[in-house]
Amino acid sequence: MFKVFIDGQEGTTGLRLAERLARRSDIKLLSIDSALRKNTQARLEKISQADVAFLCLPDAASKEIVEAAKDCPTKIIDTSTAFRCSDGWAYGFPELGHAYASAVANSPRIANPGCHATGSIAVLAPLVAAGLIPADGLYTLTSLTGYSGGGKKMIAEYENLHDPELDAPRLYGLNQKHKHLPEIAKYAKLTTAPIFLPIVAPYYSGMLVTAGFANTQGLPLAALRKLFADFYGKQPFIQVQTSEELPKMLGSNNLAGKDSL
């Protein structure tokens, strides 16, 4: 039985992760007494007992427990932004290539990609790798997300407040300093940060990311699809759709509750 501990299981990310892992018959979820949720020593003991520990914590709290667990051999997967661009941490996007997959398999420390970053990198990385778009180009990313991505506070606002402003999509990150921008640039291999437009909309879950770029080489749509299909191969969590599969409308909540792209 594979033992897993989730530090921060009471938060939105921790709860959804626990729901998924609870479906697995080969995984035992280690629990901690609610009175000890903020007790560093008690958490360290649970981390040490686990084969894998997930940290579903704010950045500062993740840094604190990682420092405390620096000598612990348990594989730690952090879901905050704290370590996504840090040396010594594997970036948890194995679909980007063999080097990433190998690092995820072998590293004791893994940084889980951000939600907006996942879709953005998934689109841009194959294009940059193929030389279809330049690394120093200026690209625009629009990412529409449901309100659950904002955690318990935002969920409560949307579900309990009666504010007319919440009835329409809202653009944020207007200063172009969104916390996902550094990892998007790093792992898409961009030398110029893209213009990033994140939008939260009045639906619970789901995301739709679009990337704008000039197809200066004039590749037909079929060739672009083949480029993505060849890059991702038979990855189980990424499907490259054919023209026959494309709907007339693409809903941003089509994959809500799923783990695939």
Predicted regions and their residues:
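Short Gly/Pro-enriched turn/cap motifs at secondary-structure boundaries
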Residues: 172-176, 199-202, 251-256
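C-terminal active-site/capping subdomain that shapes the small-molecule cofactor and substrate pocket
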Residues: 212-261
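Electropositive phosphate-/nucleotide-binding environments in soluble metabolic enzymes
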Residues: 11, 59, 117-121, 174-178, ...
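Active-site-proximal catalytic alpha-helix in oxidoreductases
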Residues: 146-164, 175-182, 201-213
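General small-molecule cofactor/ligand-binding pocket signal
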Residues: 30, 195-197, 241
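Short amphipathic alpha-helix segments
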Residues: 18, 179-191
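Interdomain hinge/lid region at the active-site interface
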Residues: 192-221, 228
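N-terminal Rossmann-like NAD(P) cofactor-binding subdomain of oxidoreductases
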Residues: 1-172, 189
